[in-house]
Amino acid sequence: MAKRYLINIFLLIAVLCGFSSCEEDPYYDPYEEITYDLCNYVWTDWFVVDGLDCEQQLTFNPDGKGWDTRIYHYPSGRIDREEIPFYWDWDNYYTDILYMDYEDAQTTLENVWISGRTFKCLYNGEWVTFKAY
């Protein structure tokens, strides 16, 4: 009888521990986590524009400011660098849309996905994958 009682107590404790581990973390904030990931790296992509290799580096700061750095590589070996400041913000705390406000235009990054050192999004209508450096 005492043995069965102890077994029931252990089963009850195991069940209660199992239920408590399914509870969501009240301090987990996906907005804060993805913002940290976004601001923790320089995001780099390569593409071709007017026959030139272009390296684009996006830098996001936690204060909502950022830099779009474009480095153009000419066949002659010459390199031109263009740094364009912007302001950025999430779309009403939804972390799948990001607005980048430049001096003369706005760019919307849609379907934003960040995992590890990879940042994928729909950038001006084209799928782009940035790598973190």
Regions of interest found by a model, annotated:
Residues 1-9:
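Bacterial N-terminal signal peptides that target proteins for export
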Residues 2, 14-42:
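Bacterial Sec-dependent N-terminal signal peptides
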Residues 8-10, 14, 35, 115:
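Residues marking helix boundaries in flexible regions
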Residues 30-53, 86-92:
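Tryptophan-anchored aromatic micro-motifs
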Residues 51-54, 67-128:
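Contiguous, well-ordered beta-strand patches that form the walls/edges
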Residues 56-60:
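Broad, structure-driven detector of short, well-ordered beta-strand segments within folded domains
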Residues 131-133:
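Short, solvent-exposed mixed-charge patches
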